[in-house]
Amino acid sequence: MIIIPAVDLKDKKCVQLIQGDPNKKHLELNNPVEVAKKFVDEGAEYLHIIDLDAAFGTGNNRDVIKNIIKEVNVPVEVGGGIRNLEIAKELISLGVDRVIVGTKAILEPKFIDDLNKEIGKDKIVLAVECKEGKVVIKGWKEKVDKTPIEVIKEFEDKVGYILFTNVDVEGLLKGINVDIIKELIEKTDIPIIYSGGITTLEDIKALKELGIYGVVIGSALYKGLIDLKKALEIVKN
């Protein structure tokens, strides 16, 4: 299992939002490049970067992403506002390892087919965000009448990874829902990256035991609830 620290970008700063709400931040740091470097210095082997401005349609942070890639020697995955092939290709050309797509793919499945032809499925992460058992899109504002497993099955042979977010606990530091993750792992062969509500080393142990591919950790690292080095030790042992 790999641990993937999250660096969320807004207005060229590193932020942490509560429940994805742009007006509710519980953290703002001025130098995202330094934040990324610190995670890598502590042993992170992969980074998860979300461009919130691109996601909200209020600009983008591509220059910051470019600088992070230049300064760290680990691969990064990037999500947020990837609504056409040009943006995806531009990110890959900047040195991004994987692009994360969600809403666009779920509303227009052909987008994944086209993206697959352009960059290959190993570079594609499908974001499946779940609230009260159903998939949500458009920044968690709209519900789709499908369960996570139904959406995953639809794209199973077209994407390399699934990023599964449990919106019910995201950014609230509430712990994880093991049952929902267990079901996904049992029903699909795609590597699953889990995000949402991870607060303790116990959560990480539980996810490791389930056999998940990776976990994204945000709030808990920034608030000092999880020590990255200790988390990485659990994963390696």
UniProtKB/Swiss-Prot annotation:
Organism listed in the record: Methanocaldococcus jannaschii (strain ATCC 43067 / DSM 2661 / JAL-1 / JCM 10045 / NBRC 100440) (Methanococcus jannaschii)
Pathway: Amino-acid biosynthesis; L-histidine biosynthesis; L-histidine from 5-phospho-alpha-D-ribose 1-diphosphate: step 4/9
Annotated EC: 5.3.1.16
InterPro entries linked: Aldolase_TIM, His_biosynth, HisA_bact_arch, Isoase_HisA-like, Isoase_HisA-like_bact, RibuloseP-bd_barrel
Taxonomic lineage from the root: Archaea, Methanobacteriati, Methanobacteriota, Methanomada group, Methanococci
Alphabetical UniProt keywords: Amino-acid biosynthesis, Cytoplasm, Histidine biosynthesis, Isomerase
Catalytic activity as recorded in UniProt: 1-(5-phospho-beta-D-ribosyl)-5-[(5-phospho-beta-D-ribosylamino)methylideneamino]imidazole-4-carboxamide = 5-[(5-phospho-1-deoxy-D-ribulos-1-ylimino)methylamino]-1-(5-phospho-beta-D-ribosyl)imidazole-4-carboxamide
Active-site feature positions: D8, E129
Compartmental location: Cytoplasm
SUPFAM superfamilies the UniProt entry points to: Ribulose-phoshate binding barrel
CDD domains registered for this protein in UniProt: HisA
The name this protein goes by in its record: 1-(5-phosphoribosyl)-5-[(5-phosphoribosylamino)methylideneamino] imidazole-4-carboxamide isomerase
A Gene Ontology biological process term: L-histidine biosynthetic process
